[in-house]
Amino acid sequence: PDKNSSSAETAVFDLIDPSFCDVVIIQSDRFGNYDFCKALAQKYREMGLPVISLGENISDCINFEYRRGDGFAVIVSHMVKYHGYTNIHMIAGVKGEYYSDERIMAFRNVLSENNIPFDDSMVSYGDYWSVPAIDAVKKLIKENRLPRAIVCANDQMAVAVTNYLQDQGISVPDDVAITGFDGIETIYSADPTVSSSGIYPLTNAKEICHAVNTIFSEGYAAKNIPLFPELIINESCGCKSEKHRMKFNSSASYNELMNKFYRFQDENIILSNISERIQQCKSFADIADEMRKDDLMYAMTCVIKSECIDESVNPEEKIQMRFRNKMFVLYDSDDIDLKKSVGEKFIPYNMDGRDIIPNMNGFIGRCLIFTALSYLGVPMGYTCYHFSSYIPSNYYKIPQTVNMLNNALGGLRNLRHQHYLLNKVDEISRIDALTGLFNRHGFLIEYENILRGLGSNSL
């Protein structure tokens, strides 16, 4: 979400009543908007809800502090102290960005502790992406400044730089040692595997669960919980890979990648067809059948604001809505299937906004994934996915499906509003503004309509 807290992405939080929650967990370091996370946490705390913030320190919350600077210092220290590299260069993230600057400071501190002089030429910027990182290395090669070791501010850049140097005939780690940061899965499929530092997801999950259990058993108390990234030893730094930490199955990974790619292509075609059919609907009541024709939208519910089905409302107009308002259940795959099994038809209906989704208690034990629906910056509602089992491909398709619904529903709203306006213009053109009676044009049209209605009985 951007810094405008009324944006479509953030406005969805006004549509969901949080009072049913036992604990609210905000992944604040992923929002990219500290002020919004702070306001959200404050609202939930005022409601008496325990709040856990992941990544950012927020007052009166249980804050998980991800000590990324300390973690980056660990990987730099490994390069300097263990391997003895002194001719070392850093490819940072975005210039002036907080996390990038934090890692630069960690880099400088480690060099200072080991009496290695630092100057600004020892830092390049790769914007956390592959191409800028490779461009930075090309510049070093062109200027004949290729160092003995390169530490990258994230794994994406480290893998890209490793591949590029290898393609140029420069051995990693024999000629240039490389490290990354974050600990993403890709580092294990690189050749050589890339050394890194990161907080293991399982470690993170265990700590969060422990914090939640503590709230239930001992009560809520705001505090800061530090989590430190762990060193991940692989081959790109000059070490042997820690095979015991994670075994990489190249065959399984390749098959999964191919399945993602081809399934993505096939599903995009299906979703495009669904989008076309939705926008050809005469009303929102017809949409559910079109969405369920293809067996792609299962285990999901789509709830929109009631004014979205009102053709007279301008689709570009932002109307403030709260969870106490009525919401419109546009689609419910489970209900559709149930009614179909007994020969009935699903009919969209209004629902109390405080219910969030129909039959919510029936999904106890499932992970509910909510995503905002918006079009041209105007919030429309949300979808809720409630898969009963963990099949990765189900989760991969969520962004595709939501993007399709955003465009299809937004497009339909525009078309229906245009149809409404045309009818109003036509209606105005038939009526005399002074008397309210048909004018000549309106009378002739109405007369012709009456004749058509009479058919062969007309005189």
Which functions belong to the PLM regions below?
Residues 240-280, 421-427:
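Signal-transmission linkers at sensory-effector interfaces
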Residues 138-242:
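Flexible loop/turn connectors
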Residues 446-459:
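Active-site-proximal structural segments of metal-dependent nucleotidyl cyclase/transferase enzymes
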Residues 358, 365-374:
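A short, aliphatic-rich beta-strand micro-motif
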Residues 424-446:
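Conserved nucleotide-binding and Mg2+-coordinating catalytic segments in signaling enzymes
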Residues 59-90, 101-109, 130-138, 158, ...:
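Hydrophobic alpha-helical segments within soluble ligand-binding/sensing domains
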Residues 1-77, 142, 156-158:
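Alpha-helical recognition/docking segments in bacterial nutrient-uptake
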Residues 390-410, 419-423:
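Amphipathic alpha-helical "output/dimerization" segments
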